[in-house]
Design a protein with these regions (language model features):
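Unchanged
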Residues: 2-358, 390-666
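Ser/Pro-rich intrinsically disordered low-complexity regulatory regions in eukaryotic proteins
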Residues: 372, 388-389
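Long, charged amphipathic helices and adjacent flexible linkers at domain junctions
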Residues: 360-375
Length: 666
């Protein structure tokens, strides 16, 4: 058997085992679980959205209820770095465990850093990459997200550690078997996997000291430098930093000491390490001092998450003195898989042309799609029967209705398209702002929001420079006080409704290609506009979540009815709802569909719903199964009566001939 096939079989079985661990964590009180699961967020709005997602899962019994959950936003919306966010986590746990010498002792803690801006995949800036879709339907019928994958995949880890904190990066999916882990330690342990040097040069790489401890941490180094350092083995592979790191309770206590006085969190010390100026990095500032070959002089020169300045210099000195005596073990897992949700193009390719690479995990191009069609990827999308979607396009939380045409390779997210044509290789992402106004952002799939003008900045198949020249747009019209990155360019008009916002986005596209009329250019110029950055910060996160739920309900209802229309037995058709079953909202949608359906489909809908309600003993708004059952048989009765009545002879000319007629039996 080939290695790749064995590797995939192992990972598939590992995932199935993790799912069983996950189900046990929901049902068994004595199953060892995480004591804390803590997420970090970029601002209060994103934190509220994360908390709503967690609460929704808790209400549905989809998360272990004994675990303590928390979401910690960067303070006042200031970017404090992943290290600053980690200090917030340490402070929070210390506050939850008052009067304890070491609050991390005998505590199993999972931390997911998910507070980035998602500049390289802007459609996830508002709601965060953490709850972005994964192209898989979970065994209970739900469409999966990165968060769900983390929860399932890490369910077996608590039983493998006595105490400590596992820190994960919110944009990396790591697949492994928890039985591969033995993290009984006081310092740190980095989880690594073997990957080709071509992959490693774009990420962090660990250099093994020969005794399975980290000798050196190499972040985004050239292939040549990695080879010079001896980080590349004979097979051309490196020990890749997966973003997953264990911190023992002793190391955590040492870090807590930096922000404490006499065992109590000191606000002055805390703010020295958690602020926008220092912007401490978890990976750069916490891991570097733990490598055995690290020096304080080189530590000062390490690239910063923000800027190298005096505030960071002082923090690094104190961090070094506190934790350099600890070491970092290297846990190189094999078989294991590292999936990075990086740029928009990488995401699109992952869910379209490369999705077959993960068939062993039941990944597929379409998850929760109303009317299945071939050739494109979709997640929670309602695609009309007459709509045309181009090859390798990706639709996510979107409506595509009427005679709409979507170009090849285009990404559509949170947008409703009806009876219009969308070009290929672009991204359309709709945002509802706080207050109800709408913005539709448009950019090219390969565009990099981190690119800076006046350098050549790719934009919608041309360049931002060319866009400005052709339409007479000045630098001052796009940027006010911000730096001249595409990320900050005020390109997207604020509109009263979604359709107008979509129309204005298409005007931006026409302007990029020199096809906009003077009137259209003037409409754009006179409008109030936002950038990728400002629009995500002003987004109504609750509206995002409501749209996702609204779409999911409509898609599930449509899938169920589609199955019935294709002649599927009702019990099989009901499986689209998974273990969640039929919610109150879906029940209402199905009744509305039944009202409009032709006879055969109508009675099948009523019959299926009534059987489901009877079996599950479900009552919706006081309506019992027998009422729906009666609707089914009343419909049949009415149709039979109507059809029979049609066949009766015309009695319009009948008259009473006699007052009485006597009939005698023989």
């Amino acid at each position: 058997m080939k290695y790749e096939k064995m590797n995939n079989l192992f990972l598939r079985q590992s995932y199935l085992d993790s799912w069983e661990d996950y189900e046990r964590s929901l049902k068994k009180k004595k199953f060892i679980k995480w004591d804390y699961i803590i997420l970090t967020a970029s601002n209060d709005a994103q934190a509220a959205a994360y908390q709503n997602q967690i609460n929704d899962r808790l209400e549905k019994g989809l998360l272990p209820e004994d675990t303590h959950y928390a979401v910690l936003p960067d303070p006042d919306g200031k970017r404090v770095g992943s290290g600053g966010a980690t200090f917030q986590v340490l402070r929070y746990i210390a506050q939850q465990e008052p009067g304890v010498e070491n609050p991390f002792k005998e505590r199993r803690i999972l931390v997911i850093h998910s507070g980035g801006d998602s500049k390289r995949v802007p459609q996830y800036s508002a709601i965060g990459k953490l709850f972005s879709p994964v192209p898989r339907e979970l065994p209970d019928g739900r469409g999966s997200t990165l968060f769900d994958e983390f929860i399932v995949g890490m369910s077996g880890v608590p039983s493998r550690i006595q105490e400590g904190m596992l820190v994960l990066s919110g944009d990396v999916l790591l697949l492994f078997n928890p039985l591969q882990i033995d993290a009984q330690l006081d310092g740190a342990a980095a989880i690594s996997i073997k990957e080709p040097v071509e992959t490693g040069k774009n990420h962090g790489v660990f250099l093994n000291d020969g005794h399975d401890y980290v000798k050196c941490f190499l972040h985004k180094q050239t292939e040549e430098h990695l080879r010079e350092m001896g980080a590349v083995n004979e097979a051309g592979n490196v020990d890749l930093d997966t973003g997953a790191v264990f911190f023992g309770s002793g190391l955590l206590q040492a870090l807590l000491g930096l922000i404490s006085t006499d065992g109590q969190v000191d606000d002055v010390k805390f703010h020295q390490f958690c602020n926008e100026e220092a912007r401490i990095s978890f990976y750069g500032d916490f891991l570097y001092p733990l490598a055995s070959d690290s020096t304080l002089e080189d530590f000062y020169k390490e690239a910063a998450e923000g800027e190298l300045n005096e505030a960071l210099h002082e923090c690094r000195t104190k961090i070094w003195n506190a934790i350099h005596s600890f070491s970092m073990k290297l846990l190189c897992l094999s078989p294991a898989e590292f999936i990075h949700f990086g740029t928009t193009r990488e995401l699109r390719d992952l869910v379209t042309r490369n999705v077959q690479d993960y068939e062993f995990l039941d990944w597929k191009m379409q998850v929760n799609v109303a009317v299945p069609k071939e050739g494109f990827a979709a997640h929670n999308a309602y695609v009309g029967r007459h709509a045309e979607v181009g090859k390798e396009a990706y639709l996510e939380n979107a409506y595509v209705l009427g005679n709409a045409k979507i170009g090849e390779g285009t990404v559509i997210s949170h947008v409703k398209i009806k009876n219009c044509e969308i070009p290929g290789q672009i991204v359309l992402h709709g945002i509802e702002l706080i207050g109800g106004k709408k913005v539709v952002r448009i950019y090219g799939v390969p565009d990099n929001p981190k690119a800076k003008y006046p350098n050549e900045v790719a934009f919608l198949g041309t360049t931002l420079n060319r866009f400005m020249e052709m339409n007479g747009v000045t630098k001052e019209e796009l940027w006010k006080d911000e730096e001249t990155y595409l990320w900050f360019a005020d390109l997207y008009p604020i509109c009263e409704d979604h359709k107008t916002a979509l129309d204005m986005a298409m005007i931006v596209y026409k302007m990029a290609h020199g096809e906009a009329s003077e009137e259209e250019i003037q409409m754009w110029r006179s409008s109030e506009r936002m950038s990728l950055y400002s629009s995500f910060n002003a987004a109504d996160i609750d509206a995002f979540c409501e749209l996702n739920t609204f779409l999911e309900n409509h898609v599930l209802a449509r899938r169920f009815i589609w199955n019935l229309e294709q002649g599927m037995f009702y019990q099989e058709a009901l499986k689209v709802f998974g273990k969640r079953g039929i919610s109150e909202e879906i029940f209402r949608l199905l009744l509305e569909e039944a009202e409009e359906a032709e006879f055969s489909l109508k009675i099948r809908i009523y019959h299926a719903i009534s059987r489901y309600m009877k079996k599950t003993r479900t009552v919706y708004s006081g309506i019992h199964y027998d009422a729906i059952e009666s609707d089914c048989y009343d419909t049949i009765q009415n149709v039979i009566y109507a059809e029979t009545e049609k066949k009766l002879p015309d009695n319009a000319g009948y008259r009473i001939a006699k007052d009485r007629v006597d009939i005698e039996l023989p």
